[in-house]
């Protein structure tokens, strides 16, 4: 997503938890002739999120676009979800988005401009077996974003949500392997009306770019990127 952003914007702050990804992304962005401020950040830490926002404004001069994209997933039946796993999901997926919006909105209000995109999931739009805990956080993210969008609608700020289905990233690969099992590919293809097993990262990037380059008439909306899954929803 960060590598696609320079096509539409000049400067970028990229907070992520892994040093290797930070270096690689900064290199890709730099090759396009754009500035990138790479930061390590744990969105569960409210003070760290606030400091990252402050550093962005100091180094870049403004905070025009924020994408709250941090997230984790855990699968299993609800009765098998431990308190620890539940709290990890809530702290990262929901509280992390809350920390991000709460820190970004005052800066954008002062500017009278801002574009915020929050990543939910198709799991935030429907029930899915063995994803109850994860889906609860993603439903919550939508409620958070929609309510906040109403609070800032008169301030030149838009807040929208994207709901991608599964994206081909390391998150869907078995630990310690670069290969994705054939049976998983077949199962995912059967699940989607459009016969693809999953999205590519750039599919999600294009949706984000559409929302952040909007002139200001779209807010509180949910954009589903579901390979046809939206057609099955009531």
Regions found by a protein language model. Name each.
Residues 101, 137, 145:
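Active-site helix of classical SDR
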Residues 106, 150-151:
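Alpha-helical segment proximal to the catalytic Tyr-Lys
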Residues 153, 158, 218-221:
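Short, small/polar-rich loop/turn modules that mediate ligand/substrate recognition or access, typified
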């Amino acid at each position: 997503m960060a590598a696609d952003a320079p096509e539409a914007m000049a400067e970028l702050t990229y907070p992520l938890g892994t040093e290797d990804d930070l270096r690689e992304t900064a290199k890709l962005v730099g090759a396009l002739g754009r500035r990138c401020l790479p930061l390590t950040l744990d969105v569960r830490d409210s003070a760290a999120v606030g400091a990252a926002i402050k550093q962005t404004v100091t180094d870049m001069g403004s905070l025009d676009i924020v994408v709250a994209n941090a997230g984790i997933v855990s699968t299993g039946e609800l009765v098998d979800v431990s308190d620890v796993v539940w709290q990890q999901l809530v702290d990262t997926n929901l509280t992390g988005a809350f920390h991000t919006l709460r820190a970004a909105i005052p800066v954008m209000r002062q500017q009278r401009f801002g574009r915020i995109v929050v990543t939910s999931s198709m799991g935030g739009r429907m029930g899915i077996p063995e994803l109850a805990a994860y889906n609860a956080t993603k439903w919550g993210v939508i409620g958070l974003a929609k309510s906040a969008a109403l609070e800032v609608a008169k301030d030149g700020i838009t807040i929208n949500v994207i709901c991608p289905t599964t994206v081909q990233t390391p998150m869907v690969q078995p630990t310690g392997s670069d290969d994705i099992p054939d049976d998983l590919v077949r199962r995912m293809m059967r699940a989607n009306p459009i016969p693809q097993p999953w999205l590519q990262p750039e599919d999600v990037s294009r949706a984000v770019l559409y929302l952040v380059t909007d002139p200001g008439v779209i807010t509180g909306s949910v954009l589903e990127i579901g390979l046809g899954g939206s057609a099955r929803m009531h």
